[in-house]
Amino acid sequence: MPRLSEPSPYVEFDRKQWRALRMSTPLALTEEELIGLRGLGEQIDLLEVEEVYLPLARLIHLQVAARQRLFAATAEFLGEPQQNPGRPVPFIIGVAGSVAVGKSTTARVLQALLARWDHHTRVDLVTTDGFLYPNAELGRRNLMHRKGFPESYNRRALMRFVTSVKSGADYACAPVYSHLRYDTIPGAKHVVRHPDILILEGLNVLQTGPTLMVSDLFDFSLYVDARIQDIEQWYVSRFLAMRGTAFADPESHFHHYSALTDSKAIIAAREIWRSINRPNLVENILPTRPRATLVLRKDADHSINRLRLRKL
């Protein structure tokens, strides 16, 4: 049985308890497909998909159906005709967590699994990177050293985008970010057309504030968690690996790191982590963890072995 000690809004599971909740949910993902979804340095395998992600997909599938019934009940109470009866209200999922914790892989795997369920085959994934202010604007605001912190995002534009999707607009456009250029791409748009499910992935998507925030529009949210020292090690390892991949491209904003020796690269990575990523995690990202519907806790080997579900 899941662990229930003191009265709490959460119920905690180890992996064995959680995997039992898969029931008969089929695995509709191949090893080749998983390789394409796996991020640099991530260790996720099909066993973890079966034991962690399939129960999660089943839970979300059940909640999507329940949410649609709730919307229908509210419309009935208000005496309103059901708008676009063949087009359900989009179900919005937020995925949050630190840099290098693996939230992008989690979001991609979840997208692939949810799109294989009947009744919600249109599943879009948008990252909040595109809503960062362009570098020129960050420079004008003296925020380049705060890139990734909440104030470096155009939160009004992000709110307008999610509101448009949630309200059933025929389409909504999200700006596009280039990790190669380390900047938004002028004029580039990710067009979302009335999805059944929208997954919004980003560092600060669970932020709260004195006014309506994007997290207030979520129907379900995930926080990918791990010990801070483990995330730091994953960040450093990824930084070292990227010298031979993304950094090696002459067009990369970080091309100058590609020629660093291991020792110098480790020093550079730890300096970036300790001056930018760790403070952002501690000050802004980690405090939002209690707001998540489900927390996925990773061990040092990247495996998910503990989960905490919000039941209230």
Curated annotation (Swiss-Prot):
InterPro entries given in the database record: P-loop_NTPase, PanK, PRK/URK
Keyword Nucleotidyltransferase among record annotations: no
Record's protein name: Pantothenate kinase
Main location: cytoplasm
Domain of life according to the entry: Bacteria
One Pfam family it belongs to: PRK
Gene Ontology cellular component annotations, sorted alphabetically: cytoplasm
CDD domains hit by this protein: PanK
Family from the record: Belongs to the prokaryotic pantothenate kinase family.
Catalytic activity: (R)-pantothenate + ATP = (R)-4'-phosphopantothenate + ADP + H(+)
Binding residues for ATP: 97-104
Subcellular location(s) of the protein: Cytoplasm
Keywords, in A-Z order: ATP-binding, Coenzyme A biosynthesis, Cytoplasm, Kinase, Nucleotide-binding, Transferase
Class of enzymatic activity (EC top level): transferase
Keyword Lipid metabolism listed: no
Pathway stated in the Swiss-Prot or TrEMBL entry: Cofactor biosynthesis; coenzyme A biosynthesis; CoA from (R)-pantothenate: step 1/5
UniProt GO BP: coenzyme A biosynthetic process
Enzyme Commission code: 2.7.1.33
GO molecular function: ATP binding; pantothenate kinase activity
